[in-house]
């Protein structure tokens, strides 16, 4: 095309033409390649620029821009002036409607960047402005397009233009970044940031990020806009998945630029933002930081600890969303295992600290802080918990037992805090850790561990076995707890455990918790003990769960009796047991065993508390003990009980040195001593007796409470309780207090009265404690009981025997009535003996004797004479056959009655003695009725005659030296009872047993009267104690065991009675003196001789060897110091010594023998085989054996034996000829002789006792009288032949 043509065309499109013509012509020229290629751009612009300058709207403007664009495209080598000209005109486009066409033109203009250097900043500025304008338009159009489908083509056009601008900018920066001014670049970037924040279109953001990448790659971003760029990148990182990788790359590139530290600081600032509008950026930043955490940038100094610090700062926003993003991003990052191996310990700890803080957003976590997190939504919480659990599983797999200790500790803390969300595997891991940490109370977080255990225990989702396992952990923790933490830890752990028992139906759980309570008892803080005790008592009284009620009662019992606690705690427990024992709301099978234990409670004379393990009449309540198996017993107590250790002394073991079980028996209060609620106990016992319906239970209570009352140390200081007991007995016997006992075949009112009378009998022991007004009440009750029957009367008699002398004024006042009631009753044999003992005690006491009125004395004498008459008639009525035991018993009562009459006679006033003597002589002679006097009757007759008109007072005379008694004997006969002293020289204790026909009483003395120093030394050696403090404090307590396993054995012949424990003080000495136990029984010496013929006849008669075999059967062999051999046989009441004598006549002259036994063959032991004139013994026993036996081999076979027992005088008790003519075994002879000789010894003791209890007669006179009885003069021994009418024959069958 020619130049003329081009000019013509330019004229046609110039402003000289109308707009329509110009538009039509320009529109045709757009596609005219020749024109576009040859036209001069400056002329073209000059011809049409008025359209843009004048802002002519319409299609012509768009057509003009298109024409320019095509012409520029055809000019491949445009000069910079042409480019500048085009840009200057295009930049004047009036509005955004023409931006798409204009941008296409600008793309062509800037296709060669080096030719736009002069106006590149202008281009950047224009494009930046257009960018914001276009985005505003696009954003509005997008909002409208959501409401309708109109304008979609226009929107696409603008969107394409908008993205082309970004691409154009990207290309311009890539070609010549150095051409641009920093301020313009920053302005443009600010607009890009604004666009990125305002759009959600991923492609738009991708193009912007591409621009940012280009700028970062080819140039430098200003610090002014750096923060905004980092923020928008963080937003994109979180919000758009497609741009996430680009955002990460942008940050990584920024950390490699010159502004890397500013970029890092910008990232930090973003994490510290607190505005809610920044949450998206923060969460994106969390993702970026988490990604950097796995791959630390090397171009900048940035540690993992710093990055974790960024994450830590982000949590200050208190946003649960941020917490979720943090734990999620970290977990995604940690899935790359390779980098985990290179983490340092401090990095691990920082990481775990961060996760621990995130756990505070979980409501079930241990460190949960309500109100800390905002916008809490259930799904967010669940997601956080899920990711935390994933972290735990990951760490559990990564961390090994040999990992860093501090890291493992922090991991365990993280595990512990999230225990509510753990899987079974992690739970097992956690509790394994807690089990190991339970023994480390000083480690950090130890108290938090216990909170976990407690929460786990109360989580019902766990199994029963797991709960039992947790209780085992509680045991370890509580035992390991330091002293200073016990009040807090025990109150926080143990008390809730105990209080939760009422919600548990499992017997295993109840047993485990109660066992834990008992085992921990010795280290209880005060506040915990009282809280636990209150809970147990509440369950005992109010629980509807039978198992829990039983176990609670057993726990209180165990803590009281089988565990060591502070004395003040023990006192409280005793109070609780007393309340349980009388609470009738508690079922009987649970209540009775508690009552039984309390009845077994004792205090020894050193004030130590123990339990008598041998209660009387246990079979009465055995039915209530079937369910009572107490499993809560301390190991030491169990060991003692299993081994059945008697009197085991544990007082020197360390635990008892700290807490001795010593009872406060004084009126002052002391924290170091236990206090027993004696007053409440006595009150409750009487309450139970009056309200209990089962007679067997009441009977058991009365029997054992009587035994307990014998423990004087327990009740001596409780005057109020004793008075209450006395008043209760009075109300019951007088009918003021009714009983609820169900009448049955087993219940008789007499048995109840007897039991109550025994209580009254023991109460008399406390007569010195009670006020004098109670003494009269004693006698009034005794008279009331005596009126109720023979059984109660016997108990009353026994009571008066030991107490009437101590309360003389009241005895004188009330005894006459008691005597009258008793003597008018039909007394049994036991009661008769007992009553005679009482009369003897009264008659032997001067004050009581003188206080009796004449009528009373006469009635007593008549009663005794009636007894004498009855027993003499019984003896005479048997004619030939008389049982030796019956004979001895009758003679005992006769002699005793004479002694009582004698004492009463001697004790009366001298002015009344003549009248009384006349009365007694008359009655005595009427009694004899012409029969001959026995020896003792002659003594009594002479007594009456001698003192009828004399006022000589009775005096004591020394014992005659001719009476030699065995000093090692331990028995005395006193007032009709045998007193036996059993000494335990190893322990320094001894007991005195009073055996009488009506029963047995035992007094136990807890110290020996021998050298204390030697005893203490021996005790110290036995105990091997070296502590000086222990020696000073405890070695003075010389006693049997003071702990709970001490046993007091009841006497075998009186199983219902226990010893009365007495301390050997002044009162003990008075008791011994009042018993008058000073006369020992003589040992019965028996001579044994062999009657043999000539030596040549030794083989045809009984040989010496056979004789010694028979002698050995009499008793055990014993060698004396002088070389003599004797044979000793002992029983409970007698001791016999058999001595071989070669010459009976000579032996009997030098010593006093009770009997002579002659053994020989039947041909040698005959009526004339012995010179009777030389025999000075009361009894001769002849044993003759068959003369045809001569070998030892025949000793144990049956053969013919003749046995003769011959009395040498007129001894009425044995005035008989015993003859045994029978085939028996020779070894049966010994028991036969033992029985017979024991009767002889008992008979002798009666007479010698009768002599002793009358000290007003000269001893020599009684010796003469004794020999007179046996018809043996002291100066000349005369032979006495047995009168035939006084000989009785009978045969004894073995």
From Swiss-Prot:
GO terms for biological process: negative regulation of TOR signaling. InterPro entries: Tuberin-type_domain (IPR018515), Tuberin/Ral-act_asu (IPR027107), Tuberin_N (IPR024584). GO terms for cellular component: cell division site; cytoplasm; cytosol; nucleus; TSC1-TSC2 complex. It comes from the Eukaryota. Pfam families: DUF3384, Tuberin. GO terms for molecular function: GTPase activator activity. This is Uncharacterized protein C18B11.11. It comes from Schizosaccharomyces pombe (strain 972 / ATCC 24843).
């Amino acid at each position: 095309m020619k130049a003329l043509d081009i000019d013509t065309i330019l004229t046609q499109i110039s402003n000289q033409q109308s707009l329509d013509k110009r538009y039509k012509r320009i529109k045709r020229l757009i596609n005219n390649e020749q024109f576009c290629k040859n036209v001069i751009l400056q002329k073209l612009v000059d011809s049409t620029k008025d359209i843009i300058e004048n802002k002519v709207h319409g299609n012509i403007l768009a057509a003009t821009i298109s024409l320019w664009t095509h012409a520029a495209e055809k000019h491949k080598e445009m000069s910079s002036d042409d480019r500048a000209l085009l840009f200057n005109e295009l930049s004047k486009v009036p509005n955004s409607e023409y931006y798409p066409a204009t941008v296409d033109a600008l793309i062509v203009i800037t296709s060669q960047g080096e030719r736009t250097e002069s106006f590149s900043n202008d281009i950047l500025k224009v494009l930046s402005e257009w960018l914001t304008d276009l985005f505003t338009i696009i954003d509005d159009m997008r909002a409208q397009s959501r409401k309708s489908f109109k304008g979609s083509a226009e929107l696409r056009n603008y969107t394409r233009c908008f993205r082309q601008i970004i691409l154009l900018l990207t290309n311009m920066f890539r070609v010549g970044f150095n051409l641009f001014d920093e301020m313009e670049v920053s302005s443009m970037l600010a607009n890009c940031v604004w666009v990125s924040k305002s759009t959600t279109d991923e492609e738009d953001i991708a193009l912007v990020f591409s621009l940012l990448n280009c700028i970062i790659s080819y140039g430098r971003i200003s610090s002014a806009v750096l923060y905004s760029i980092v923020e928008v990148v963080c937003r994109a990182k979180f919000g758009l998945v497609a741009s996430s990788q680009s955002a990460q790359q942008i940050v990584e590139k920024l950390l490699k630029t010159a502004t890397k530290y500013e970029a890092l600081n910008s990232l930090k600032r973003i994490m510290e933002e607190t505005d809610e509008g920044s949450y998206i950026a923060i969460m994106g930043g969390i993702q970026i930081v988490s990604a950097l955490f796995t791959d630390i940038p090397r171009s900048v100094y940035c540690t993992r600890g710093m990055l974790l610090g960024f994450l830590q700062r982000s949590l200050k926003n208190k946003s649960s969303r941020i917490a979720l993003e943090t734990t999620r991003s970290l977990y995604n990052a940690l899935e790359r295992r390779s980098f985990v191996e290179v983490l340092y310990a401090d990095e691990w700890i920082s990481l775990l600290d961060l996760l621990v803080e995130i756990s505070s957003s979980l409501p079930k976590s241990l460190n949960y802080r309500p109100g800390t997190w905002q916008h809490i939504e259930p799904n967010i919480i669940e997601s956080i918990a899920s990711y935390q659990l994933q972290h735990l599983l990951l760490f559990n797999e990564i961390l090994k037992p040999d990992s860093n200790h501090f890291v493992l500790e922090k991991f365990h803390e993280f595990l512990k805090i999230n225990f509510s969300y753990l899987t079974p595997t992690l739970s097992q891991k956690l509790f394994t850790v807690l089990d190991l940490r339970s023994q480390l109370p000083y480690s950090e977080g130890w108290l938090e561990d216990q909170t976990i255990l407690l929460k786990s225990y109360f989580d019902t989702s766990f199994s029963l076995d797991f709960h039992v396992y947790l209780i085992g952990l509680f045991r370890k923790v509580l035992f390991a707890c330091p002293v200073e933490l016990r009040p807090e830890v025990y109150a926080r752990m143990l008390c809730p455990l105990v209080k939760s028992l009422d919600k548990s139906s499992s017997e295993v759980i109840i047993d485990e918790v109660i066992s834990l309570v008992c085992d921990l008892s010795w280290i209880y803080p005060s506040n915990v003990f009282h809280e636990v005790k209150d809970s147990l008592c509440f369950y005992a009284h109010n629980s509807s769960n039978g198992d829990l009620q039983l176990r609670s009662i057993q726990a209180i019992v165990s803590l009281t009796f089988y565990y060591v606690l502070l004395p003040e705690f023990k006192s409280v427990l005793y109070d609780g047991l007393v309340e349980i024992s009388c609470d009738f709301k508690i079922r009987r099978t649970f209540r009775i065993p508690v009552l039984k234990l309390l009845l077994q409670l004792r205090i020894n004379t050193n004030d130590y508390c123990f339990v008598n393990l041998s209660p009387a009449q246990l079979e009465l309540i055995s039915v209530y003990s079937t369910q009572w198996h107490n499993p809560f017993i301390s190991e030491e107590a169990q060991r003692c009980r299993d081994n059945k250790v008697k009197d085991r002394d544990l007082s020197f073991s360390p635990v008892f040195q700290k807490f001795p079980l010593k009872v406060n028996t004084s009126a002052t209060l002391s924290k170091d001593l236990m206090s027993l609620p004696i007053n409440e106990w006595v009150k409750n016992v009487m309450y139970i007796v009056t309200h209990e319906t089962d007679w067997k239970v009441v009977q058991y209570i009365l029997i054992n409470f009587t035994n307990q009352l014998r423990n004087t140390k327990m009740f001596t200081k409780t005057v109020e309780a004793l008075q209450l007991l006395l008043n209760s007995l009075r109300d019951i016997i007088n009918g003021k207090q009714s009983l609820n006992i169900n009448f049955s075949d087993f219940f008789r009112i007499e048995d109840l009265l007897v039991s109550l009378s025994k209580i009254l009998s023991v109460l008399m022991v406390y007569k010195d404690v009670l006020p004098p007004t109670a003494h009269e009440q004693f006698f009034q009750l005794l008279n009331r009981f005596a009126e109720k029957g023979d059984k109660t009367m016997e108990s009353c008699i026994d009571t008066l025997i030991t107490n009437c002398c101590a309360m003389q004024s009241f005895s004188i006042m009330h005894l006459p009535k008691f005597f009258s009631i008793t003597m008018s009753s039909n007394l049994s044999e036991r009661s008769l003996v007992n009553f005679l003992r009482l009369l003897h005690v009264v008659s032997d006491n001067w004050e009581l004797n003188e206080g009796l009125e004449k009528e009373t004395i006469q009635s007593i004498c008549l009663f005794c004479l009636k007894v004498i008459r009855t027993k003499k008639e019984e003896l005479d009525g048997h004619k030939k056959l008389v049982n030796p035991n019956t004979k001895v018993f009758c003679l005992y009562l006769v002699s005793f009655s004479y002694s009582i009459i004698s004492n009463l006679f001697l004790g009366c006033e001298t002015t009344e003695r003549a009248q009384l003597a006349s009365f007694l002589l008359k009655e005595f002679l009427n009694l004899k009725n012409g029969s001959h006097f026995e020896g003792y009757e002659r003594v009594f007759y002479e007594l009456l005659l001698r003192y009828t008109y004399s006022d000589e007072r009775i005096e004591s005379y020394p014992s005659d030296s001719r009476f030699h008694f065995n000093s090692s004997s331990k028995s005395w006969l006193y007032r009709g009872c045998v007193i036996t002293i059993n000494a335990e020289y190893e322990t320094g204790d001894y007991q005195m047993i009073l055996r009488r026909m009506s029963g047995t009483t035992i007094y136990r003395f807890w110290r020996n009267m021998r050298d204390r120093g030697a005893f203490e030394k021996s005790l110290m050696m036995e105990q091997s104690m070296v502590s000086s403090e222990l020696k000073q404090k405890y070695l003075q307590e010389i006693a049997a065991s003071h702990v709970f396993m001490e046993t007091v054995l009841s006497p075998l012949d009186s199983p219902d009675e226990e010893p009365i424990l007495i301390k050997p003080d002044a009162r003990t000495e008075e008791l011994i003196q009042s018993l008058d136990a000073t006369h020992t029984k003589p040992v019965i010496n028996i001579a044994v001789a062999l009657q043999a013929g000539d030596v040549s006849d030794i083989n045809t008669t009984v040989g010496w060897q056979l004789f010694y075999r028979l002698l050995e059967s009499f008793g055990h062999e014993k060698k004396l110091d002088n070389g003599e051999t004797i044979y000793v046989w002992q029983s409970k009441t007698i001791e016999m010594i058999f001595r071989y004598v070669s010459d009976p006549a000579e032996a009997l002259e030098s010593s006093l023998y009770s009997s002579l036994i002659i053994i020989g063959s039947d041909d040698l032991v005959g009526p004339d085989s012995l010179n009777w004139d030389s025999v000075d013994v009361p009894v001769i026993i002849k044993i003759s054996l068959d003369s045809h036996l001569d070998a030892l081999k025949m000793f144990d076979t049956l053969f013919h034996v003749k046995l003769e027992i011959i009395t040498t005088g007129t001894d009425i008790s044995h005035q008989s000829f015993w003859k045994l003519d029978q085939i028996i075994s020779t070894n049966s002879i010994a028991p036969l002789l033992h029985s017979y000789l024991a009767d002889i010894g008992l008979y002798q003791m009666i007479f010698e006792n009768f002599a002793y209890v009358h000290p007003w007669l000269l001893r020599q006179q009684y010796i003469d009288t004794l020999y007179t009885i046996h018809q043996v003069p002291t100066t000349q021994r005369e032979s006495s032949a047995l009168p035939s009418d006084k000989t009785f024959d009978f045969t004894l069958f073995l």
